[in-house]
Amino acid sequence: MTAAVVQADQRDLVRADIQGVVGGSYWHTTESLRTVEGTSKTRELLDYLGEPTGTEAYLIAHERRVAPGDTDGEGARAGCLHSLLTHVNSAASPTGPVELFVLERRLTARMANNDARTKARLLADGRITPGTRLYQTSPNDEQLLWLPDLVCSAYRHQITGRTPDLFPRISAMCTVLP
């Protein structure tokens, strides 16, 4: 699971720039990496994201082991979400505390409720601030959701060795969380 932190005054610019690279308002990294042209666009987007003058920050919560009984991966997701929310909502966040988290819409209400329960537990434990909000939407409606998808795919390809030149393009901007 990956978070991309984009400052409020940069969001419109970043949206316009990534749509310009893609040439439209639709992007899916996994789908794009299946073609030569899509892989080229992926590299171009990652080069944009990795630009050293940018203010974006990318955080990766890497759950190394999915428990044997976690057949749907929801436990691992909750662990990753816990790591991201507590880090990005704290003073340790590279851009200062963040309270609005925009997530890709989950497939089912049950899955969305699992995320809400994770947030509620963190709030009850005092791990996140009361103003913390989760908002779920589609990457078709919020192009900034392309960023965590790109970063996560690049990181995964680094681990698997499938396309090892992707992650180095953004690695300086990334923090891998436990």
Task: Describe the predicted segments one by one.
Residues 1-178:
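Phosphate-ester processing/binding pockets and catalytic centers
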